[in-house]
Amino acid sequence: MTTSPAATENRTKRSSTVRAGEASGDRLRLSVYDMLVGPISTPRVFFYRETLDGEALRASLGRVLRDFPVLSGRMQKDPDGGLSVLCNDAGVRFVETYASGPMPDHGPLRTAKKGIERYLSMVLPFWVVDRDTPLFTVKLTHMKGGGSVLGFMMNHAVADGTSYMRFLESWSREHRGLDHPAPHFDREVIAALAVPSADGARTGGAHLTVTRRGRKSAFVSRLLLASAGGVTTVTTRFSATELAAMKDAATADLAGTQRWVSTNDALTAHLWKVLGTLRGRPDTASERLGLIADFRPFVSGVVPDAYWGNAITNTRPGMTAAELRSRSLGEVAAAVRAGYAENTKERIGEEVAFLDAEREAGRFPRVMTTMALDSFDTTIALNNWSKLPFYDIDFGTGAPFWYDFPSIPIPWTVHIAPTPPDQDGGRDVYMALPRAQVRTLRERERSWAGRFHRYAGSGEPFPLTF
């Protein structure tokens, strides 16, 4: 590891560049899935009761970067308009600072959404390509009286959520002197998936849209308006007991049909039904559920489980608003299960072929997921993170007691996350909702909390946190 303190270092803040100390100089050409998400950075913030050692963190980060040279590289544009990462060990930004206040008692009743940016070393997405801008930043904030907060920003064009957490898990294991699996970076495994449809039809674009002139700009404009206060994240927690009751109810609905649904299917269906009621759309209106999925398990044998990059796709099961409101939990959960089952090796191969063709035709900058384009209208997007190891990121002082991220500006976006170890088996749910629906929830909070937690049994339902 090499560390270069910046000239701005002072008593309360230290900014350094952490490097592996070795560089291959290799150029990693990013895949079509990497390019689809673009060079935006994804934030993660972890709260620890005990104080972390900044010097030791910088040392272990330098060591683990030897296995993750992409993160200490820089992004560059290729002559054909594609993107690559030059593995030149230009380094990772590491900021260490001290807060004047004590550690807040964060949790589902007191999230860290408000002011969470103070724990992050931000990166502007339009200041990444062909610039000396790090693809990963760390900010370590020590709280008055003890405890530390670790905030990360990782460029989404190099890693999806699974890869992100595998890196953090590898770093934490390196920090504790434990082995960690080697990542697989070769993007050719994604290119090798490409299989044009047998009849020549462009079926690979079923969940993608090549936008017309102005449509993408209009979407970005709506997104900027939403980020200026038009969307609020509402948080609530479902206990393990509640989830078990939910799955039992869904299973009972499907008795005799030979259909199976998981606990996550049941929770997803329940959220879709409640949010569908909250949306209050006309009976004949189309309701879509965008199911974001890691496709590694569906293409095993071609894309290794250790693949480190973007391997995410989505499907969009749908029904009318009336059907969503009237169908049983089990029927809707079965539709969710069928939606995930669409992620076959053949479908992923056709999608890769479609994206490759759009890149070769020079139309790739206009390609967007239909799920994102429809987020202001017909689609609720759901990202299930419940199996990611948020509460396993232990840097020698124990697991974090809370994990959080800034509010999502895209309306009708739902994230499902695991709960901390003391609430093992539960789920924390974050819902980005438009202002009008948030107002409805606030005006009748007790009633709506009851709807969300109808499977909780007796007692007060878990509150909604705004």
How should each PLM-predicted stretch be described?
Residues 1-208, 229-292, 296-306, 367-466:
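Non-catalytic N-terminal regions of enzymes
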Residues 329-398:
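Acidic, glycine-rich loop-and-strand cores that form catalytic or ligand-binding grooves
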Residues 212-215, 238, 328, 347:
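Non-membrane alpha-helical secondary structure
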Residues 11, 40, 217-218, 323:
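Macromolecular interaction modules
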Residues 197-229, 350-357, 361-368:
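Alpha-helical membrane-targeting segments
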Residues 226-235, 302-339:
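A short, structured beta-strand-centered segment in the mid-to-C-terminal lobe
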Residues 32-39, 211-223, 304-313:
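Short, compositionally biased low-complexity segments
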